[in-house]
From Swiss-Prot:
<feature type="binding site">
    <location>
        <begin position="69"/>
        <end position="72"/>
    </location>
    <ligand>
        <name>GTP</name>
    </ligand>
</feature>
<dbReference type="InterPro" id="IPR053931">
    <property type="entry name" value="RapZ_C"/>
</dbReference>
<dbReference type="InterPro" id="IPR027417">
    <property type="entry name" value="P-loop_NTPase"/>
</dbReference>
<dbReference type="Pfam" id="PF22740">
    <property type="entry name" value="PapZ_C"/>
</dbReference>
<keyword id="KW-0547">Nucleotide-binding</keyword>
<keyword id="KW-0067">ATP-binding</keyword>
<dbReference type="Pfam" id="PF03668">
    <property type="entry name" value="RapZ-like_N"/>
</dbReference>
<dbReference type="InterPro" id="IPR053930">
    <property type="entry name" value="RapZ-like_N"/>
</dbReference>
<protein>
    <recommendedName>
        <fullName>Nucleotide-binding protein SAOUHSC_00787</fullName>
    </recommendedName>
</protein>
<feature type="binding site">
    <location>
        <begin position="18"/>
        <end position="25"/>
    </location>
    <ligand>
        <name>ATP</name>
    </ligand>
</feature>
<keyword id="KW-0342">GTP-binding</keyword>
<comment type="function">
    <text>Displays ATPase and GTPase activities.</text>
</comment>
<dbReference type="GO" id="GO:0060090">
    <property type="term" value="F:molecular adaptor activity"/>
</dbReference>
<dbReference type="GO" id="GO:0005524">
    <property type="term" value="F:ATP binding"/>
</dbReference>
<dbReference type="InterPro" id="IPR005337">
    <property type="entry name" value="RapZ-like"/>
</dbReference>
<dbReference type="GO" id="GO:0005525">
    <property type="term" value="F:GTP binding"/>
</dbReference>
<comment type="similarity">
    <text>Belongs to the RapZ-like family.</text>
</comment>
Amino acid sequence: MDNNEKEKSKSELLVVTGLSGAGKSLVIQCLEDMGYFCVDNLPPVLLPKFVELMEQGNPSLRKVAIAIDLRGKELFNSLVAVVDKVKSESDVIIDVMFLEASTEKLISRYKETRRAHPLMEQGKRSLINAINDEREHLSQIRSIANFVIDTTKLSPKELKERIRRYYEDEEFETFTINVTSFGFKHGIQMDADLVFDVRFLPNPYYVVDLRPLTGLDKDVYNYVMKWKETEIFFEKLTDLLDFMIPGYKKEGKSQLVIAIGCTGGQHRSVALAERLGNYLNEVFEYNVYVHHRDAHIESGEKK
């Protein structure tokens, strides 16, 4: 058995954690539908024992997802140490997925569901203080996560689609590159590893016929690409990424989020994200996905 076959034969454990209200339950449901054995709210101290069960070769435990949250704050404090211990001592492949969202979005979700945040201590603390406290306590586990997903602007359907892309096809290369366009006026892409600001390029918004269109339309795309500044920028951008991406892969990173921003996220960033996605698909044998976060907002199209 070669090394690749050995890797494929190993059991896989995905720890799903993150901010309360960011989508952990939805992710666990999605993974369960995809054939994962799922466990909700396992105390971190029991993680090594669970891994021992997985090492016994039970076929039903070959792909496992465990949701762990901050409800048992004292127990949660040991999670980073437990994960590091399992990674160093076990043959089980362990990844950590961290889900987050903006404070404003989390407050909105709690108001919609009328549920209490687990750290509100039966109403003794405000919701915003509970969220901020949780964010601070989770900063360490976030720093070791293989996947960080910001669900602020993701619908439940979009979150499920992203999870399926990452985990559904075992034959795919495990390293994933997500290229996202966004508009600075709608907020920066919070889960981005690399952010590139293209607001210095000529803006199609000021061409009346192009204003209602997006960078997905041929006329807008051609307008953005016809400028010398665009060609110079794209050449420098791809030269930089050609150098950086193999380094990220070598260091064990599972995903890379590249965000390209313009003013509204409708024209320049969309066109360049499309071009960059095509380039990366041609140059690298990795999973490359392109997403346009804000194009529908400015153009008035339905999402």
